Amino acid sequence: MGRARMRWISRTLPAIAVAAIATVGTVAPASATPDAGELGAQWTATADGPATYPGMDIAWDVPIRMSDGVILKANVYRPADADGRPVDTPFPTIVSMTPYTKLVSALAEAAVSAPGISDAVMDFARDINFSGTPLSGITDLTRALSGGGLRTFTVDRELIRSGYTQVVVDVRGTGFSQGIWQVFQEREQQDTIETIEWAAQQAWSNGRIGMSGVSYSAINQIQAASKRPAALQAIVPIEPGGDLVRDVVAPGGGAGVGFLPFWLAAVNGLKLIPDVQALMQGNLDQTWLRDRIADPATFFQYLIQAITIPDVDSIPPELQTLLEPDSSLRLAWLPHAEQITAPTLLYGGWHDIFTNSQPRLYNAIPLAPGKKQLVMGDTYHLNPGSGFGDPGYPPRLDVLQRAWFDRWLKDIDNGIETYGPVTSYQQGNGWTTTDRFPRAGVEHRRMYLAAQPSGTTATSVHDGSLLASPPSGTTTLTVAPGLSSLCSRDAAQELAGLLAVIDGCAKDNRIAERDALTFTSAPVAAPTQISGPVNVHLNTVLDTTDGYWTATLDDVAPDGTSTVLTSGQLTSSLRGIDEGRSERSANGDLTDPFYTLTLAARQPIVPGRPTTLDVGLTATDALLQPGHRLRVSVAASNFPKGMLLRPLLNESRLAPQHLVLDPASPSFVNVPLDVPIP
């Protein structure tokens, strides 16, 4: 049946397979330089060299019974001989847990491996070049196709033919697996551990387990590794999240309405696709069918409630679980990276939907640098590893993954542990290698928001200055919620990179700044590094009991182009912070506020009364070139990345908001710089 199904897919779905290749990105590797020098060339030669085994065998829909009786379905990919028979030798085994269905993985694998087709598509993608045009973002996305990320999303046939087994499993409640989709909760996490243990005990496994996968399949790697199953010896999470509420569900306390509806629709839609072969044979799994009927639209109720409940008193207990930090749901979503002992190669992007967590995860893992690696690209969620494998870039992501597994699952001394350990695309500069993040030598410094014009923009609500010392005199500036943020880097980030094809939105913030107050520094005279988290401290006044603030940190070029380096947002009434988890600089200023984000700690605003709050911006890594300026923009909305929960939106009345610039209670940005900006 396995080979028959393989023939069915290869004969009837080539068009879908080719389409799948266009929807996934890529990522890459590491050493003492970003391209890893001679070692990188060796890793690439190994990955692209002759296969140890000529074929690949697939066992379809293998049942794995969980401890509570629910049956998960897995495809098992094994090395095969020239006749297609699986090789009897036990191999290290790679486990991938996916909610996007192993059928999608199989189609993507067919696209990557189809003779003639995949090479043609990759060559076509390399030839697409919109650089220097207003649509250069198209090239940024298409260059991901040749970077190796697709093979980390799906099944890497070449990895298997080199002597690995891969197990791709539909997580509970998705694909052909029974049960109710748990969205990372404890039962789903237990399933991952039990699947790892099951794989380690099979005759085709030598008991040494690794994990691979992108996004959802990266998050469950972090969760599994934190539980330290004995068999799990290496992970390669590509674009993982950590604290999902703060990352994407409710950044700054506002609903992430740009990403969540489409993502939930995709997973819930895919999970309803039945096993067509079983259906045609009259033996469709009735338990699977009952489970899908019982819960066809998992988690949509939270989103609907968040945007429809009219007032705080009407919030139902179900939604309150998302708003209480000690709820079982919120606790299950915390990463506990500090408990990881398996060697970890982590890829993230400075504009990924999970950027907030990626450097935090790396720093929290208690392993020596080298045994843990961080690669951060100038990328969105859809294009991990864009350009990898090109001169000056890290090696392709599949190359890096192969080297990582060879080192930690096969004990091959290939030098991968000498890479990095932090390989970062420094915005405004390019690919760099450093020994830590944030970089050594930076210091958080105040720069004050001042009303005096900088003369650098005529399109923002107010053109102010960014100064090294407090301004004289008190000024109140007003900014109203608007929709110009629909064309912004934050919108591109929230939409996983789809909007990044338009440079005027993703690479220049001046359209979004039409609804913002801007504060711009003098030009820097020497290269100036920015590395780490950023905090914007605001002295605010509202006419209502709630509001929403967003801030960006921008690199302003001599021609006026304003490129967002990082951003953050905050619901005014949810400004309370957890001091034990927040970070401050030596003078007591917050550098990285950690919000409690709970209804119990909500602090409604007293209209007309000045209220200070801190807008934390995600960590960044950048270099201001001589002649460039630093800018902070402040706005009263950030749709679609974040929107006030409906009860709080009603309280805000979408009224204009006021920023007070008062030397006695100044507004300022606390930014990590290696040298002061005058």
Residue positions per predicted region:
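Alpha/beta-hydrolase active-site loop
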Residues: 150-151, 161, 183-202
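Short beta-strand/loop motif that positions the catalytic acidic residue
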Residues: 340, 346-348
